[in-house]
């Protein structure tokens, strides 16, 4: 017997496979200034990271906390399982309606739009590289 009541249990996992056509749009660079379909449904004040290249391409991570940790440690909010990623690699910090990525002492560094950065305020469409992973930042809020 199971205790299944027919109502799915709420999961804290925020990853899922994203549309393949979105990855192609991001590759072509056509979505840098426009929000792709689905982003308008994000909760207010949140943003989305989509894995563009690397293991688990297409996975997405919701940024909906003040600080979201990314790294190879299994307890990381964003678990990036590859030896090129430090256990505590970077943090995504929400400051008002902006997000900032901050390298927290990683061995291989954190890159924003292919430039090494200790910290950087993110704009819609920015590409963040953490080890072998390339993630695209998508902000659901309206930018001026």
Swiss-Prot record:
ATP-binding keyword on record: no
A cellular component annotation (GO) from this entry: cytoplasm
Keyword tags: Cytoplasm, Phosphoprotein
Residues annotated as domain FHA: 68-117
Disulfide bridges in this chain: none
Name of the featured protein: Oxoglutarate dehydrogenase inhibitor
Organism: Corynebacterium jeikeium (strain K411)
Pfam families registered for this protein in UniProt: FHA
NCBIfam families documented for this protein: oxygluDhInhib_OdhI
Major location category of this protein: cytoplasm
Function: An essential component of the PknG signaling pathway. When unphosphorylated, it inhibits the activity of 2-oxoglutarate dehydrogenase. When phosphorylated it does not inhibit 2-oxoglutarate dehydrogenase.
Encoding gene per record: odhI
Residue(s) carrying Phosphothreonine: 14
Cell location: Cytoplasm
């Amino acid at each position: 017997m199971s205790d299944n009541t027919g109502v799915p249990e709420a999961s804290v996992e925020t990853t899922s496979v994203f549309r393949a056509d979105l990855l192609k749009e991001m590759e072509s660079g056509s979505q840098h200034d426009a929000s792709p379909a689905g982003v308008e449904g994000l909760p207010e004040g949140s943003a989305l990271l989509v894995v563009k290249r690397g293991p688990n391409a297409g996975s997405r991570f919701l940024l909906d906390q003040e600080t979201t940790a990314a790294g190879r440690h299994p307890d990381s909010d964003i678990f990036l399982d590859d030896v090129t990623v430090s256990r505590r690699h970077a943090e995504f910090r929400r400051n008002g309606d902006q997000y900032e990525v901050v390298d927290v002492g990683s061995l291989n560094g954190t890159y924003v739009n292919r430039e090494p950065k200790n910290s950087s305020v993110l704009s819609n469409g920015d590409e963040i590289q953490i080890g072998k992973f390339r993630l695209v930042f998508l902000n659901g809020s309206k930018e001026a």
